[in-house]
Amino acid sequence: MPRPALRSRSLRRIYVKLPSGKTAIHYERKKNDISKCAMCKKPLHGVKTNFLHKYGKSEKRPERPFGGYLCSSCLAQLIKAMVRQ
């Protein structure tokens, strides 16, 4: 039976075949999905995905309006549309 900490389904199970022929289970953290732009769904650049607690606020996302939510091209379109209204 695995330790209580390893029973969590938030850990990914990897079955590894050992030289003896037996299989062992290795546990590792699941990787988060890449963050995407809310308008065009393209991957966002400059946005960290894993282990966010290790980074400061400025390292997690770009420091501009809608940073970490919209890509730069969609933001430019949005600003142009707001100015032209």
Curated annotation (Swiss-Prot):
This is Large ribosomal subunit protein eL34. Disulfide bonds: none annotated. Belongs to the eukaryotic ribosomal protein eL34 family. InterPro entries: Ribosomal_eL34 (IPR008195), Ribosomal_eL34_C_sf (IPR038562), Ribosomal_eL34_CS (IPR018065), Ribosomal_L34e_arc-type (IPR047868). GO terms for molecular function: structural constituent of ribosome. The gene is rpl34e. Keywords: Ribonucleoprotein, Ribosomal protein. NCBIfam families: PRK04059.1. One of its GO terms (cellular component) is ribonucleoprotein complex. GO terms for biological process: translation. HAMAP family: Ribosomal_eL34.
